[in-house]
Amino acid sequence: MQKICFLLLLVLTFASGQAQSPAEVKLRKKDYKRDVELVTDSGTMVIRLSDATPLHRDNFLKLVKSGYYDGVLFHRVISQFMIQTGDPDSKGAPAGKPLGNGSPGYTIPAEFRPALFHRKGVIAAAREGDQVNPSKASSGSQFYIVQGKKFTDGAMDTLERRRNIVIPADQREVYKTIGGSPHLDQQYTVFGQLIRGEEVLDRIASTPTSKAADRDRPLQDIRIVKARLVKRKR
C-alpha cells in the first residue's frame, strides 16, 4: 500500500510539473544567457533573443520553459514574407481548420526599437490589426520569422513616400543585400534573430499552402516538435 501511494505521488508530481503554466515559470539568471532551439518537422532553428525588448524576451523564455510551444503548427506561411506560429489552438488541429486566433489570454505592450528592423531571419510578435489594437500590443504567444525578399532603392523610395517614413541608410543596405520586409518596421515588435537554421526557414517558407478557408496554412502540417533553451555557442 505504501509503495502504491508513493508511486501515485510521483505520478501526480510529474503531471503537475508538466502542467506548469507560463505564469508559474521562474526565470533564472542563466536563462538570459541561453538561446532558444526550435526543433521542427523540417529541421532545427536557433534564436537569440534581444535584451532591448525585455518584456517580449521574458515572456518568450517563460513560454519555452513551460512547454507552451511544443506541438504547435506553423499555421500561416507566405513565401518571400514570413512563417508564423505560436497558436495554441493549432495543437492537434484537424486538416482544413482555420487557425490564428489562439492566445494565452494576454497581450504584451509594443517595444519598438529603431535598431531592430525586419531583416531576413528576425523574430517578431504577431498582433491584431490597428482597428481593434491601436496601441499595437503584441500577441502573448504568436510570432513570425521573416523570410522577406531583397528590395531595390527604387522600391524603398516608393515605400517611404507611401508610408511617410525614412529607412536609414544602413538598413537600406541590408534590405538590398540580405532582404526582409521593411513595411513592417515600427509596426510589429522585433525581439530576436535567427542565428542558425536559415535553410530551415527557407524550406518552410517554400511549402505549398491552402487557398481555402484555412488560407496560407501548409497543406502538410509542419510543427514545432520541441522548443527548449540551449547553451550559447561562442
Predicted segments, located by residue:
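Sec-dependent N-terminal signal peptides
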Residues: 4-13
